[in-house]
Amino acid sequence: MRLSYVIVVIATSFLVTTEALSTNTGVQAANVVGPAQRLLRKHYTAAENDDDSEARALNTEKMKTMLKAGMTVDDYAAKLKLTDKIAAAANSARAMEKLGETLKMKKLLRYLNYVAEHTAV
């Protein structure tokens, strides 16, 4: 026998044993039966036309009257019931970041900035 025939026989047996020439057309994938509900995250935003939002908003006039009445930033934090939450979040940057996203904390920071701007050192 010639050497080329031996190589062809070896190559053929190799292809057969490794199933490289397999005729199996079965796809091994999950079958989709029907539409399924996807769990997507949705971030809700405040409505633009909310009537209560202006009543609860901390505007310049309210901050001015609070400062004239002698309300300190600590007093305002106590009024918003944030003192315990701030103390609890003081050791964790993640907790403080989460607290900073709340409406009450934003109000407190706005009042803090107002007091810092309008109080002489």
Curated annotation (Swiss-Prot):
Entry-linked InterPro entries: PexRD2_WYL (IPR040691)
Signal peptide, first to last residue: 1-20
Keyword list (alphabetical) reads: Host cytoplasm, Host nucleus, Secreted, Signal, Virulence
- For this UniProt entry, what's an example GO CC term? host cell cytoplasm
Task: Name the domain of life this protein comes from.
Answer: Eukaryota
Q: Where is this region: WY domain?
A: 57-121
Per its record, what triggers expression of this gene product? Answer: Expression is induced during host plant infection.
Presence of the UniProt keyword Hydrolase in the record: no
Compartments where located: Secreted; Host cytoplasm; Host nucleus
Q: What is the effect of changing residue 109 to D?
A: Prevents the ability to oligomerize and the interaction with MAPKKK epsilon
Q: Where is this motif: RxLR-dEER?
A: 38-56
Quaternary structure, per UniProt, is: Homodimer. Interacts with host MAPKKK epsilon (via its kinase domain).
The record's family statement is: Belongs to the RxLR effector family.
Role according to the record:
Effector that enhances P.infestans colonization of Nicotiana benthamiana leaves. Induces a weak Cell death response in N.benthamiana. PexRD2-induced cell death is dependent on SGT1, suggesting that PexRD2 is recognized by the plant immune system. Interacts with the kinase domain of the host MAPKKK epsilon, a positive regulator of cell death associated with plant immunity, and perturbs signaling pathways triggered by MAPKKK epsilon.
* Domain remarks: The RxLR-dEER motif acts to carry the protein into the host cell cytoplasm through binding to cell surface phosphatidylinositol-3-phosphate. The WY domain contains 3 alpha-helices and is required for the interaction with the host MAPKKK epsilon.
The name on file for this protein is RxLR effector protein PexRD2
Q: Which gene encodes it?
A: PexRD2
